[in-house]
UniProtKB/Swiss-Prot annotation:
One of the primary rRNA binding proteins, this protein initially binds near the 5'-end of the 23S rRNA. It is important during the early stages of 50S assembly. It makes multiple contacts with different domains of the 23S rRNA in the assembled 50S subunit and ribosome. One of its GO terms (molecular function) is rRNA binding. Keywords: Ribonucleoprotein, Ribosomal protein, RNA-binding, rRNA-binding. Belongs to the universal ribosomal protein uL4 family. Residues 45-95 are annotated as: Disordered. NCBIfam families: rplD_bact. It comes from Chlorobium chlorochromatii (strain CaD3). This is Large ribosomal subunit protein uL4. Part of the 50S ribosomal subunit.
Protein backbone atom coordinates (compact mmCIF):
# COMPACT_ATOMS: atom_id res chain seq x y z
CA UNK A 1 0.00 0.00 0.00
CA UNK A 2 1.27 3.47 -0.90
CA UNK A 3 0.57 6.66 1.03
CA UNK A 4 1.43 10.23 0.17
CA UNK A 5 3.51 12.12 2.71
CA UNK A 6 2.10 15.43 3.92
CA UNK A 7 3.91 18.35 5.50
CA UNK A 8 2.78 20.25 8.58
CA UNK A 9 0.87 22.68 6.36
CA UNK A 10 -1.33 19.82 5.17
CA UNK A 11 -0.05 19.79 1.59
CA UNK A 12 1.61 16.93 -0.28
CA UNK A 13 5.40 16.84 -0.32
CA UNK A 14 5.53 14.76 -3.49
CA UNK A 15 7.04 11.86 -1.58
CA UNK A 16 5.34 8.47 -1.33
CA UNK A 17 5.94 5.80 1.31
CA UNK A 18 5.19 2.11 0.89
CA UNK A 19 3.53 0.33 3.80
CA UNK A 20 4.58 -3.28 4.28
CA UNK A 21 1.86 -5.76 3.37
CA UNK A 22 2.83 -8.13 6.20
CA UNK A 23 2.09 -5.37 8.73
CA UNK A 24 -0.48 -3.06 7.13
CA UNK A 25 -2.10 -5.43 4.65
CA UNK A 26 -2.82 -8.71 6.41
CA UNK A 27 -6.17 -10.44 6.81
CA UNK A 28 -7.68 -8.89 9.94
CA UNK A 29 -8.03 -11.22 12.92
CA UNK A 30 -10.84 -9.83 15.06
CA UNK A 31 -10.42 -12.62 17.60
CA UNK A 32 -6.74 -11.81 18.18
CA UNK A 33 -7.61 -8.14 18.65
CA UNK A 34 -10.40 -9.09 21.06
CA UNK A 35 -8.08 -11.23 23.19
CA UNK A 36 -5.36 -8.57 23.30
CA UNK A 37 -7.68 -5.66 24.10
CA UNK A 38 -9.46 -7.71 26.76
CA UNK A 39 -6.15 -8.52 28.44
CA UNK A 40 -4.95 -4.90 28.26
CA UNK A 41 -8.10 -3.58 29.93
CA UNK A 42 -8.16 -6.41 32.49
CA UNK A 43 -4.51 -5.85 33.43
CA UNK A 44 -5.27 -2.20 34.21
CA UNK A 45 -7.63 -3.22 37.01
CA UNK A 46 -6.22 -2.97 40.53
CA UNK A 47 -8.29 -5.76 42.01
CA UNK A 48 -8.15 -4.20 45.49
CA UNK A 49 -11.90 -4.37 46.13
CA UNK A 50 -12.79 -5.90 49.49
CA UNK A 51 -15.93 -6.56 51.52
CA UNK A 52 -15.69 -7.73 55.13
CA UNK A 53 -17.05 -11.10 56.16
CA UNK A 54 -18.81 -11.69 59.50
CA UNK A 55 -15.46 -12.56 61.08
CA UNK A 56 -13.90 -9.25 60.00
CA UNK A 57 -16.66 -6.77 60.90
CA UNK A 58 -16.04 -4.85 64.12
CA UNK A 59 -18.09 -5.99 67.13
CA UNK A 60 -20.51 -8.86 67.45
CA UNK A 61 -18.52 -10.82 69.99
CA UNK A 62 -21.27 -10.88 72.58
CA UNK A 63 -24.31 -13.10 72.18
CA UNK A 64 -27.26 -10.69 71.54
CA UNK A 65 -29.64 -12.49 73.90
CA UNK A 66 -29.88 -15.77 75.73
CA UNK A 67 -30.29 -18.99 73.83
CA UNK A 68 -33.74 -19.97 75.10
CA UNK A 69 -36.83 -18.41 76.58
CA UNK A 70 -37.20 -15.23 74.50
CA UNK A 71 -39.32 -16.69 71.72
CA UNK A 72 -36.87 -15.35 69.12
CA UNK A 73 -34.73 -17.43 66.83
CA UNK A 74 -31.39 -18.15 68.42
CA UNK A 75 -28.59 -15.71 67.61
CA UNK A 76 -24.88 -16.00 68.30
CA UNK A 77 -23.71 -12.66 66.90
CA UNK A 78 -25.13 -9.29 65.91
CA UNK A 79 -22.76 -9.25 62.92
CA UNK A 80 -24.45 -12.13 61.11
CA UNK A 81 -24.98 -11.40 57.39
CA UNK A 82 -28.75 -11.31 57.94
CA UNK A 83 -28.40 -8.22 60.16
CA UNK A 84 -27.87 -4.60 59.13
CA UNK A 85 -24.23 -3.84 59.87
CA UNK A 86 -23.30 -7.49 59.57
CA UNK A 87 -20.75 -9.11 57.32
CA UNK A 88 -21.18 -9.73 53.60
CA UNK A 89 -21.74 -13.17 52.12
CA UNK A 90 -19.59 -13.95 49.08
CA UNK A 91 -18.54 -10.30 48.74
CA UNK A 92 -15.68 -9.13 46.52
CA UNK A 93 -12.19 -10.14 47.65
CA UNK A 94 -8.81 -8.85 46.44
CA UNK A 95 -7.50 -10.77 43.46
CA UNK A 96 -5.63 -10.22 40.23
CA UNK A 97 -7.45 -9.80 36.93
CA UNK A 98 -4.29 -10.43 34.93
CA UNK A 99 -4.79 -12.21 31.63
CA UNK A 100 -1.87 -13.50 29.63
CA UNK A 101 -1.78 -13.46 25.85
CA UNK A 102 0.83 -15.26 23.76
CA UNK A 103 3.39 -13.08 22.01
CA UNK A 104 2.33 -14.34 18.58
CA UNK A 105 -1.29 -13.44 19.30
CA UNK A 106 -0.31 -9.95 20.50
CA UNK A 107 1.79 -9.46 17.38
CA UNK A 108 -1.08 -10.61 15.16
CA UNK A 109 -3.45 -8.30 17.03
CA UNK A 110 -1.27 -5.21 16.51
CA UNK A 111 -0.76 -6.02 12.85
CA UNK A 112 -4.50 -6.55 12.45
CA UNK A 113 -5.24 -3.21 14.11
CA UNK A 114 -2.83 -1.39 11.79
CA UNK A 115 -4.24 -3.23 8.77
CA UNK A 116 -7.77 -2.23 9.79
CA UNK A 117 -6.75 1.42 9.97
CA UNK A 118 -4.94 1.22 6.64
CA UNK A 119 -7.87 -0.43 4.87
CA UNK A 120 -10.22 2.20 6.30
CA UNK A 121 -7.97 5.02 5.09
CA UNK A 122 -7.36 6.20 8.63
CA UNK A 123 -3.57 6.52 8.46
CA UNK A 124 -1.93 9.87 7.72
CA UNK A 125 1.83 10.07 7.18
CA UNK A 126 3.45 13.41 7.95
CA UNK A 127 6.99 14.73 7.75
CA UNK A 128 8.85 14.62 11.06
CA UNK A 129 8.37 17.78 13.07
CA UNK A 130 9.85 19.17 16.27
CA UNK A 131 9.37 22.34 18.31
CA UNK A 132 11.98 24.67 19.78
CA UNK A 133 9.81 25.48 22.79
CA UNK A 134 6.79 24.03 24.56
CA UNK A 135 3.87 25.67 22.77
CA UNK A 136 0.40 24.22 22.26
CA UNK A 137 -0.80 26.53 19.47
CA UNK A 138 1.69 25.44 16.77
CA UNK A 139 0.76 21.83 17.49
CA UNK A 140 -2.95 22.62 17.31
CA UNK A 141 -2.38 24.44 14.01
CA UNK A 142 -0.70 21.36 12.53
CA UNK A 143 -3.67 19.17 13.45
CA UNK A 144 -6.04 21.75 11.98
CA UNK A 145 -4.05 21.88 8.74
CA UNK A 146 -4.27 18.10 8.50
CA UNK A 147 -8.00 18.12 9.27
CA UNK A 148 -7.52 16.17 12.49
CA UNK A 149 -8.38 18.81 15.07
CA UNK A 150 -11.84 17.34 15.78
CA UNK A 151 -10.92 13.65 15.69
CA UNK A 152 -9.42 11.26 18.21
CA UNK A 153 -5.87 11.14 16.94
CA UNK A 154 -2.90 8.99 17.91
CA UNK A 155 0.47 10.49 16.97
CA UNK A 156 3.19 7.89 16.54
CA UNK A 157 6.75 9.17 16.83
CA UNK A 158 10.06 7.35 16.25
CA UNK A 159 11.32 8.29 19.72
CA UNK A 160 10.21 10.23 22.78
CA UNK A 161 10.44 14.01 22.48
CA UNK A 162 9.70 15.92 25.67
CA UNK A 163 8.93 19.22 23.93
CA UNK A 164 6.49 17.68 21.45
CA UNK A 165 4.90 15.58 24.17
CA UNK A 166 4.30 18.52 26.49
CA UNK A 167 3.15 20.74 23.65
CA UNK A 168 0.39 18.31 22.75
CA UNK A 169 -0.72 16.91 26.08
CA UNK A 170 -3.25 19.70 26.63
CA UNK A 171 -4.94 19.12 23.27
CA UNK A 172 -8.23 17.28 23.55
CA UNK A 173 -8.58 13.97 21.69
CA UNK A 174 -4.82 13.70 21.07
CA UNK A 175 -2.54 10.95 22.32
CA UNK A 176 1.20 10.88 21.69
CA UNK A 177 3.46 7.87 22.01
CA UNK A 178 6.44 6.21 20.40
CA UNK A 179 5.62 3.79 17.62
CA UNK A 180 7.06 0.78 19.45
CA UNK A 181 4.83 1.37 22.50
CA UNK A 182 1.44 1.66 20.78
CA UNK A 183 -0.78 -1.23 21.81
CA UNK A 184 -3.70 -2.78 19.97
CA UNK A 185 -6.07 -0.86 22.24
CA UNK A 186 -4.32 2.47 21.56
CA UNK A 187 -4.51 1.93 17.81
CA UNK A 188 -8.16 0.88 17.78
CA UNK A 189 -9.30 3.55 20.25
CA UNK A 190 -8.08 6.36 18.01
CA UNK A 191 -10.05 7.51 15.00
CA UNK A 192 -6.95 8.37 12.96
CA UNK A 193 -3.28 7.40 13.14
CA UNK A 194 -0.94 10.31 12.50
CA UNK A 195 2.42 8.72 11.79
CA UNK A 196 5.66 10.63 11.47
CA UNK A 197 7.54 9.38 8.43
CA UNK A 198 10.55 8.03 10.33
CA UNK A 199 8.23 6.23 12.76
CA UNK A 200 7.33 3.80 9.96
CA UNK A 201 10.83 2.35 10.27
CA UNK A 202 10.26 1.86 14.00
CA UNK A 203 6.99 0.05 13.26
CA UNK A 204 8.74 -2.19 10.72
CA UNK A 205 11.48 -3.06 13.23
CA UNK A 206 8.98 -3.73 16.03
CA UNK A 207 6.35 -5.72 14.15
CA UNK A 208 8.27 -6.98 11.13
Amino acid sequence: MELKVLNTAGTETGEVVILRDDIFGIEISEHAMYLDVKSILANKRQGTHKAKTRSEVRGGGKKPFRQKGTGNARQGSSRSPIHVGGGTIFGPQPHTYEQKVNKKVKLLARRSALSAKAQAGKIVVVDDFRFDAIKTKPFADILKNLGLDAKKTLLLMPEYDMVVNRSGRNIAKLEIMTADKASTYDILYSNTLLVQKSALKTIDETLG
